[in-house]
Amino acid sequence: MFNLMKKDKDKDGGRKEKKEKKEKKERMSAAELRSLEEMSMRRGFFNLNRSSKRESKTRLEISNPIPIKVASGSDLHLTDIDSDSNRGSIILDSGHLSTASSSDDLKGEEGSFRGSVLQRAAKFGSLAKQNSQMIVKRFSFSQRSRDESASETSTPSEHSAAPSPQVEVRTLEGQLMQHSGLGIPRPGPRSRVPELVTKRFPADLRLPALVPPPPPALRELELQRRPTGDFGFSLRRTTMLDRAPEGQAYRRVVHFAEPGAGTKDLALGLVPGDRLVEINGQNVENKSRDEIVEMIRQSGDSVRLKVQPIPELSELSRSWLRTGEGHRREPTDAKTEEQIAAEEAWYETEKVWLVHRDGFSLASQLKSEELSLPEGKVRVKLDHDGAILDVDEDDVEKANAPSCDRLEDLASLVYLNESSVLHTLRQRYGASLLHTYAGPSLLVLSPRGAPAVYSEKVMHMFKGCRREDMAPHIYAVAQTAYRAMLMSRQDQSIVLLGSSGSGKTTSSQHLVQYLATIAGTSGNKVFSVEKWQALATLLEAFGNSPTIMNGSATRFSQILSLDFDQAGQVASASVQTMLLEKLRVARRPASEATFNVFYYLLACGDSTLRTELHLNHLAENNVFGIVPLSKPEEKQRAAQQFSKLQTAMKVLAISPEEQKACWLILASIYHLGAAGATKAVFSCGRKQFARHEWAQKAAYLLGCSLEELSSAIFKHQLKGGTLQRSTSFRQGPEESGLGEGTGTKLSALECLEGMASGLYSELFTLLISLVNRALKSSQHSLCSMMIVDTPGFQNPEWGGSARGASFEELCHNYAQDRLQKLFHERTFLQELERYKEDNIELAFDDLEPVTDDSVAAVDQASHQSLVRSLAHADEARGLLWLLEEEALVPGATEDTLLDRLFSYYGPQEGDKKGQSPLLRSSKPRHFLLGHSHGTNWVEYNVTGWLNYTKQNPATQNAPRLLQDSQNSVVECLPSKRKALGSVLSSEKKKRKKKKKKKCPESANSVAHTYSLSTQTLQVDALIDTIKRSKMHFVHCFLPVAEGWPGEPRSASSRRVSSSSELDLPPGDPCEAGLLQLDVSLLRAQLRGSRLLDAIRMYRQGYPDHMVFSEFRRRFDVLAPHLTKKHGRNYIMVDEKRAVEELLESLDLEKSSCCMGLSRVFFRAGTLARLEEQRDEETSRHLTLFQAACRGYLARQHFKKRKIQDLAIRCVQKNIKKNKGVKDWPWWKLFTTVRPLIQVQLSEEQIRNKDEEIQQLRNKLEKVEKERNELRLNSDRLETRISELTSELTDERNTGESASQLLDAETAERLRTEKEMKELQTQYDALKKQMEAMDMEVMEARLIRAAEINGEVDDDDAGGEWRLKYERAVREVDFTKKRLQQELEDKMEVEQQNRRQLERRLGDLQADSDESQRALQQLKKKCQRLTAELQDTKLHLEGQQVRNHELEKKQRRFDSELSQAHEETQREKLQREKLQREKDMLLAEAFSLKQQMEEKDLDIAGFTQKVVSLEAELQDISSQESKDEASLAKVKKQLRDLEAKVKDQEEELDEQAGSIQMLEQAKLRLEMEMERMRQTHSKEMESRDEEVEEARQSCQKKLRQMEVQLEEEYEDKQKALREKRELESKLSTLSDQVNQRDFESEKRLRKDLKRTKALLADAQIMLDHLKNNAPSKREIAQLKNQLEESEFTCAAAVKARKAMEVEMEDLHLQIDDIAKAKTALEEQLSRLQREKNEIQNRLEEDQEDMNELMKKHKAAVAQASRDMAQMNDLQAQLEESNKEKQELQEKLQALQSQVEFLEQSMVDKSLVSRQEAKIRELETRLEFEKTQVKRLESMASRLKENMEKLTEERDQRAAAENREKEQNKRLQRQLRDTKEEMSELARKEAEASRKKHELEMDLESLEAANQSLQADLKLAFKRIGDLQAAIEDEMESDENEDLINSLQDMVTKYQKRKNKLEGDSDVDSELEDRVDGVKSWLSKNKGPSKAPSDDGSLKSSSPTSHWKSLAPDLSDDEHDPVDSISRPRFSHNYLSDSDTEAKLTETNA
C-alpha cells in the first residue's frame, strides 16, 4: 500500500513537472520559441504541437509567400481539400502551412474521391477542378507580386531548407517517424464517416434539366377613372434578377401595377406582383417611369392595361384570382384526352430515377427477360444519352409524371421518395418558388437573392384564409397558427429548424411582421410594426455577427412571445433570450468577427459622442480583435446602421441616458481590448495592463479608478480558479478550499476576457429588460403565440474552413438536435400513441425508430454523477457532464476526456458500421459528432474546453463594478435592470411563473457563475416552453453551402450587412449562379430532418381528428334530416353510433375516416372538404336569413311609411276641422278639459316609468355586483391555479431531484457494500494466510527445539531428522514438478480447445455478419417495396374517392334526368289540357266580346240620349214659363226612357246570367283539370314506385324530391283556392253591380276588363308554357346523354372490376412478400438461437477457462509461497546450525521470545487497521441508512402532497367540464330559440303579406263602393232639383203620373236595397233622402189642391228638402256637447274616410 501511495505521489509529481514546463513554454516569448524550434529541428526530434486556448494569438500571419521548390523527377499532386492523410496535399489554414509528401499513388477513380461526407455533401455538381486557386482564395496576402505568384504552386523537396521561423509548421506523424528515431506512437487512422450515396456508374450521369414553368397568362383589364381623378392602382418600379435564354443571369428594371392603398378587394382585377406589359396596346417594358405616367395621364376616362404575374407570385395570383375573395379554390379542371394519353404513356414506360453520388438521373426501366439478369438487378436506359446500365434494385426509385414537377404539397406526390422530392424542390426552386408544403410542415429554401414575395399587400392576400385556400408561403404558416389560436384558444408556437444561413431569422421576422400587421394591436399600440422593426434592428446589432457560413448570423436563441386578447389583437409582447455567445466579444474563431454593434459604434459620425467615448484616436492593436472597418463604403454603411440603431432605441422608449450608458460600456470593452494584459517581469509575475493609458480610458468610462478596475480584473483570479461552482452539484466539501494546488491559475488575458464578456453579458441582459419594458402592457391576455429562433447547425467544413468547431457551436448544434428530436416526438411518437389509445391499427413497417445518440452523447446524465465523489462509475455520461467531472480530477487533460467519451459512445468491437454517434479524427484532440441522425458530421476541437468549467472571478466582478460606478449614468443600469425584472416577474406571475423560473429574459441573469449544466437547463426550459403549446414547424434548407464550391465572402464584407436589408447589392456572387441548388447537400438535409417519414405518416395515417361531440356539433348542419329526427339538443347515450349515422348521411368514402374510442379520425384533406361543405351550407342559410331579414325590414319600413302618410293626412284634415270648430264653445271647453286629463295620465305614466327605471337600476347593480364577484373569483382561481401549478412544478422538480439523489445514494450504498464484501473477502484470505503462517512458524519452532534437544541428547538423531527433511524437500519438489507438468498439459489442451472455439466463433461471426448484411438488404428492399405499395394504396384510395364522387354525381344526374323526364311528361299533358280549355275559353270569350261590343254601342247610345234628356230637363227646369204641351212631351219621353231603362236592365240581367254560366263552366273545367291532375299524379306515383324499385340507391333522394314536389303542389293548390275565392268574390261583386241602376254600368265594364286581363294573362301563360316546352329533339338529346352516362357508368364499373383484380394481385403479392418475410424472420430467429447457443457455450467455456486460470494462478502463487517458505526455512536451518554450538540455551529462549513478540505486534497492527476500517464502513453504512430513511420519508410526504394536488386538480377539471357542458347546453338552447324566432318571423312575414293583399283588395272594393255612392248622391241630388222644379208646375192631373213614376223608382230602389248587404252611414243617409221623397209624394198625392196652397207648397218644399238632406244638423245644434262625446265625431273621423266625408257635408 505504501508503494502504491508512493507511485501516486511520483505520478502527481510528474504531472506537476509537465504542467510547470507547459506554463513555462506559455510564458516564453516568440523569439525564445523560435530558437527552441530551430534547436529541436537540428536535433531531429521536434514535435511541437501547442494547442492552447490562445492559439490564434500565438500563430503568425504569412506576410509573404513562401518559396517552395520541387525536386527534379518528383511529381506534384494537388488534389481536393478533403483528401485523406495518406495523400499528398497542401493545406493552408489561417496562417498554417502543412506539407505532406505523396507516399502512395492515386489508384482508381474510387480512391480519388475519398473524403468527408460533409465536404462532398456541400459541393454542387462535380468536385472543384482548380484546387490551388481555392487554397489561395482562402487567404488575403498583404503583399503580392506578379513574380511571387508563380511560386505558390510549388512544394518543398525532401532536402529543402527548414521553414521560415515566421510560419508555424505542423508536420505529419509519418514525417516525424522518419526524422526521429523515437518510437512515437502514431495515432490510428481516422474512422470513415458514413456516406449517404456512394455509388457511381460508368456513364455520363446528368441531373434532369430545369424545365422553365409556362409563363403566366397575360390579363387585359380596363379601368375606369374614378371621381378622384386616378384609376385606383399604384405604379412601382424595381430591379429583378432574370436569366437569359443562353443561361446568363442579368438584372432588368420592371414596373408593377398593383392595387392602391385604399383598394382592398378585387374590383380592379389587379393583384400584388402584376408586372405591367402594355398600356392601351403599347408595350411599356422598356419605357421609363415618367413615360408610363404620362401615358396613363393622357388616357381618357378609361385605360386598358395588360399585366402578367411574376414567377415568384404566380401561385399566389392564381389562387387569389380563382374566386372573388380568394378564400376558396376552384376544383381543378378535368384532364383532356391528350393529357390522359401522355400520362398513360409515361407510366407505361416505367420511368425511374437512377440514384448516384452526384444526384439522380432520369431513366426508363427495361423489361428484362427471365434469367437474363441476376437476382436483385434491373436494367435501365438513361434518357439523355440512351446508355443502358445494369444496376441494383436499391439504386432506382419510381419517378412521377411531369405534372407533379411543381406541386405545392409534397404529400401529393404519387411516388414519395428522396429523388422525387428533390426533383420537385429543384424544379420549384428553378421557378423561383421558395416555399413548399411538406404535409403539415412548411419547407423553405433560403434564396440567394431577395425575392419579391414579402410585402404588406401580399400579407392581405392571406388574411382570413384557411390553410387549404393558401399557396405555400411563410405567411400561410402564420395565418394557420393565428386561425388555430382564435378557434381553439390555445397557445401556439412556430419553430424554425435548419442550418446556419438557411434564413430562419428572416423567416421569423416575416412571421412577426405578418402577425403585427394582420392581427393589429389594441388601443395602446403596445406592439406595432415599427416597434418590431426597431426590436429586430436592436437584436441584430447586439446579437448577430459575421461567421464563415452567414454574413449576419444570430449568436443567441430567442423566444418572441405575442400575447393576444379576446378580440385577437396583440395585447403585449416579450422577448426571452438564452445561450448568448458572450465570449465572442473577446475570443472567436479565425476569420470571424465580433458583434456588429462594435463596428457600428466605431463608424459613428457623431463627433461629440466619439469625444465622450474617447474614440477619436483608435488603437493600432486590440487583443480582442475589434478593429474598425477599412473600406469607405463599409464605414458609410456602418454609420447608417448606427443611426438606424439610435432611431430604433428611441422607438423602443430607451432614454438618451440609457443609450449613453450602453455606448459607455461598449467603448470601455473596446478600450480594455486596446489595453491588453501581461505579467510584469520585475513584480514577481504580477498581472497588469500592457498599455495603461487605454486602461485609464476604460476606467474613466466605467466610472471607477484604474486601481479598482485592475483589482476587479487581476487581483482575485484565484477566487474562481479553484473550480468552485455554486451551480454545480458535484462539488465536494474537500474541494472548496482556495489552495494553490486545488485549481489552475488563470492567465492575465483570460481575466481580461472574463471582464469583457461579463460586461457585455450585463449589457445584453439590460437591453432585453428595456425592450420588455417597452412591450409590456397591463391588459389581460387570453393566449399567446411564440416564435422560436435559434442558431442553426454550425459546421465550419461547410463554410470552407478546416478548423474544428468550438464549444459554443457545439451548444448551438445541441439545441438544434433537441428541436429536431422534439419534431420527431410530435410527428411520430405522439401520433402513434394517440392511435394506440383509440385502438386504431396502422402498420408503419418502414418507419425507422427515432435515435438521439448525438443528444445523449452531449447531455446524458447519470445517477453516479450526482454523488460527490471523484470515483468514475461505469455508467455512460454526456460530454457536458464529463467536462465537469474531468475538471475535478487533478491532472486531467482533454485527451483523458476524449478517452472517456469514446469509451462510452465511440465505436466498439462488434458494432455495426454507422451506429456510433462518435468517430475519431486524425487530428489530435479532435472528434467527429454525427448530428441530424448521422447526416451532418461536425469535427470539434476540444482544446481548452476544460477551461470552460473554471469560474472566472472577473466575470463575477463585472456587475459589482457597474453597481459601484461613480458615473451616475452607468450606476443606474443594474438597479434599473432589477426593477424591470421585478415588474416583469410580477406581471407574468400568473401565467408564466414556471417559464420565468426556467427560462428568464436572459440566460445570463440566472447566475453569474458559469456551469456547463446550465446549457442543458436552458435548452430544457426552451423545450418545455414549446411543449405547452401547439407546435408548427418550418424547415429551412440551405440550397448551397456558403463558400463551397467557390470563394467564401470575406468577413469584412459581411460585418455591416443587416438582415433587414432585402435588396441584393450589386456584384453579389449569387448573380453568377442564380438559383443554384446543391442536390447532395439538399439530400443530406432532407434525410437528416426525416421529412419523408413525416410526410408518409401524414399520408398513411389520420392526421385530423375530432371528439365525437365536437364533430356532431360542428357538422350536423350537413344532415338536416338527423336534426329533424332527433332535434338539435338531442343527447344520445351512444355518441359513437350518432357519429356513425352522421358519417353515413355525409356519404364519405370508408377509407377516408376511421372511428376511434373517443374521437373520429380523418385522412388528410377530408376534414377540409367537410369544412368547405359546411361553409357553403352555412353561407346558403345565412343568405336566406339575410334575405328574410331584409324583407322584414323593408316591410316594416313600408308599413311605417304608410302609417306616416296616413298620419300626415289625418293631421292635415284635423287642422282643417280645427279651423272650422275652434270658435265653437264646446271645442273651447274640450280644449280646456282635455289637458287636465292628460296631465293626470302623464303623471301616472311618469311614476310607473320611474319605478321601472329604479327596478332596472337595482337589477343592473345586482348583475354588476355578481359579475364583479365572478370576475374576482375567476382571477382568484386563476391565481390559485397558477400558484398550484408552480408549486406542483416545484414539488415535482424537488421530487425528481430527491429521487435522483435517492437513486444515487442507493447506487453508492450498493457500491460501498460491494467494496465492503471485497474487503471482507480479502480480510478472510489474509486471516487464513496469517493462521497458516502461524502454523508454519510453530512447526519450525518445534523442529528447531527438537533439533536442539536432539543434539544435546544424541548427535545421530540430528542426522536422522536432516535426512527426513531432505526427503520431504525432494518429495515437495517432485510434487511441484508433477503438478506443473499436469497444469501445462491441461493448459495446452485448453488452448487448443480455445483456438478451435475461436475459429468456430469467427466462422459463425462471419456467417452472422453475412446474414446481417443479407437481412439489412432484405429489410431495405422490403421497406422500399412497402413504401411503393403504400404509395400505390394511397393512389388507389384516391382513385376510389374520385370514383365515389363520380358515382355520387352520376346518381344525382340520374335522379335529375328522371325528374326532368317526369316534369316533361307532366307538362306535356297539362299543355294539351290547357290547349283544349284555351280553345273553349277563346270561343266563349269571342262570343262574349261581340255581345259586349253590341251592349257597349247600345249603352253609348243610351248615354247620349240620357245626356240630351238631362240637357232638356235642365232647360225645362230653367224655363218656368213653358206650356203644358212641352211638359206632357217631356213626361212622355221620360216614360219612354224608363221603359228603355227597364229593357236595358233585363238585358243586363240576362248578360249577368250568361256570365255566371260561363264562370260555372270555367269552374267545372278547372275541377275537371284538377281531377285529371290528381289522376295523373296517382299514375306518376305508381311510376315513381317502379323507379324506386329499379333504383334502390336513389330511394332516399327521390323521397326528398317528392316531399318538395308535394309542398310545391300544396302551394299551387293553395294559390288555386285563393284564385277561386277571388273569382267568387268577383262574381258576387258582378252580381251586385248588375242589380244596380244604369249609372253603375261602368263598374261592370271594369270587371269585364279585369276578366279580360285575367284571360289574357292565362293566354300568355299558355303561350309561355308552349314555347318553353321541350321539343322531341331535346328529349332525344337527353335520352342520348342518359345512354352515354349509362355507358360511362358501365365502363367505370368495368374499370373498377379491373382495379379490384389488380388489387387482388397486389394482395397476393403482399401475401407472398409477407410469407417470404416470415420465412426470413424464422430463419433469422433460428440463426439468432444458434448464435445465442454458441455464445452461451462460449461464455461457459470462457468461465471454465477463467476458473482454470484462477486455479493455475492460485497454484503458481502457492508454489511460489512454498518455495519462499522453504528457502526461509533452509536459511534459518543453516543459521541455527551455525549458532547451535555457541548459544544453545540462550538462543532458544531469546529466539522464541523475539519471534513471539514480532508476530504478536504484526497481528495487532493488522487487526487494529482492519477493525478501524470495519468501524469506518459501519459508520458510513449507518449514515447511509439514516439518509435513505430521511429521503424515503421525504418522498412519501411529496407523494402525499402530489396526490392531494392531483385530487384538487381533478376536482377543478371536473367542475370546469361541468361548466363547459352547461355552457354548451345553453348555447344549443340559444340556437334553438333563434331558429324558432326565425321561423315565427317567417310565419309573421307570410301572414303580413296575406293581410296586405287582403287590405289591397278591400281598399279597391271600398273605392268602388265610394264611386257608386257618389253616383247615387249625384242622382238623388238631381232628383231633388227635379222635384223642386216640378213642384211649381203641378197644377193638373198630369202631376200624378210624375208622382207615380217617382213612386215606382222609390219602390225599385227599395227592392234593390233589400238585396244589398251591409248597413253603412251612407245607406242611412240615402234612406233619409228616400223618406223625404216619400213624404213629399204623400203630400202631393191629395185629391184636390186649393190655389192658396201653392204658396205653402212653395214655402215648405225647401224647408223639407233641407231637413231631408241634413237630418243630423238639428241634433248637433241642439246638443253640441253630446255631439262631442259621440264616437262618430270624436274618434271615427280620424280613421274612416267615409265618415269624414259625411261629417264634412254635415258641417257644411
UniProtKB/Swiss-Prot annotation:
Which Pfam families does the entry mention? Myosin_head, Myosin_tail_1, PDZ, SH3_Myosin-XVIIIa
Compositionally biased region (Polar residues): 1993-2002
Name one molecular function that GO assigns to this entry: ATP binding
InterPro entries, per database record: IQ_motif_EF-hand-BS, Kinesin_motor_dom_sf, Myosin_head_motor_dom-like, Myosin_N, Myosin_tail, MYSc_Myo18, P-loop_NTPase, PDZ
Identify the stretch(es) annotated as Mediates nucleotide-independent binding to F-actin and interaction with GOLPH3.
Answer: 1-398
Origin, by domain of life?
Eukaryota
**Could you provide one GO biological process annotation from this protein's UniProt record?**
regulation of macrophage activation
Q: Where is this region: Actin-binding?
A: 1019-1070
What cellular-component terms does GO give this entry?
actomyosin; brush border; cytoplasm; cytoskeleton; Golgi membrane; microtubule organizing center; myosin filament; myosin II complex
Query: Which spans does this entry mark as compositional bias, Low complexity?
Result: 1049-1060
Q: Where Phosphothreonine occurs along the chain?
A: 79, 99, 2035
Q: Where does ATP bind?
A: 498-505
UniProt keyword annotations, A-Z: Actin-binding, ATP-binding, Coiled coil, Cytoplasm, Cytoskeleton, Golgi apparatus, Motor protein, Myosin, Nucleotide-binding, Phosphoprotein
Cellular location(s): Golgi apparatus; Golgi apparatus, trans-Golgi network; Golgi outpost; Cytoplasm, Cytoskeleton, Microtubule organizing center
Q: Show the PROSITE patterns listed in the entry.
A: IQ, MYOSIN_MOTOR, PDZ, SH3_LIKE
The principal location of this protein is Golgi
Q: Where is the composition biased (Basic residues)?
A: 988-998
Q: Where is the composition biased (Basic and acidic residues)?
A: 1-17, 23-34, 2035-2044
Disordered: annotated span:
1-34, 140-167, 982-1004, 1045-1065, 1450-1471, 1840-1891, 1950-2044
User: Where is the Myosin motor domain positioned along the sequence?
Assistant: 405-1175
UniProt subunit comment: Homodimer. Forms a tripartite complex with CDC42BPA/CDC42BPB and LURAP1 with the latter acting as an adapter connecting CDC42BPA/CDC42BPB and MYO18A. Binds F-actin; regulated by ADP and GOLPH3. Interacts with GOLPH3; the interaction is direct and may link Golgi membranes to the actin cytoskeleton. Interacts with JAK3. Interacts with MSR1 and CD14.
Q: What is known of its domains?
A: The myosin motor domain binds ADP and ATP but has no intrinsic ATPase activity. Mediates ADP-dependent binding to actin.
PANTHER family named among the record's database cross-references: MYOSIN HEAVY CHAIN, NON-MUSCLE, UNCONVENTIONAL MYOSIN-XVIIIA
Q: What is this protein called?
A: Unconventional myosin-XVIIIa
